[in-house]
């Protein structure tokens, strides 16, 4: 009977720790990942910098930051996004 109780306790602790680990990963989705792409015109003159989202994110995205500090999630395959990245890279030179 004692070994059955220990086995159940170990299973409970393992289940709790796995649930906690997956919940911690899910909390980052809204902050560091894009859930949708911006569909409007990209204000190239107002862009300051850009970065690619993590490979752990559900959607591959390029995030632009504007001079006002606004973050814009965009589709990396979009031709306007590629043009904006080239513009920002040329500004650094």
From Swiss-Prot:
Keyword Mitochondrion appears in the UniProt entry: no
Alphabetically ordered keywords of this record: Chemotaxis, Cytokine, Disulfide bond, Inflammatory response, Secreted, Signal
An example Gene Ontology biological process: immune response
An MF annotation (GO) of this entry: CCR4 chemokine receptor binding
InterPro entries: Chemokine_b/g/d, Chemokine_CC_CS, Chemokine_IL8-like_dom, Interleukin_8-like_sf
Cell location: Secreted
Signal sequence coordinates: 1-23
Disulfide bond annotation, renumbered to this chain: 33-57, 34-73
Recorded superkingdom: Eukaryota
Recorded GO CC terms: extracellular space
PANTHER family linked: C-C MOTIF CHEMOKINE 17 (PTHR12015:SF111), SMALL INDUCIBLE CYTOKINE A (PTHR12015)
Purpose: Chemokine, which displays chemotactic activity for T lymphocytes, preferentially Th2 cells, but not monocytes or granulocytes. Therefore plays an important role in a wide range of inflammatory and immunological processes. Acts by binding to CCR4 at T-cell surface. Mediates GM-CSF/CSF2-driven pain and inflammation. In the brain, required to maintain the typical, highly branched morphology of hippocampal microglia under homeostatic conditions.
Record-stated family: Belongs to the intercrine beta (chemokine CC) family.
Name recorded for this polypeptide: C-C motif chemokine 17
Organism: Rattus norvegicus (Rat)
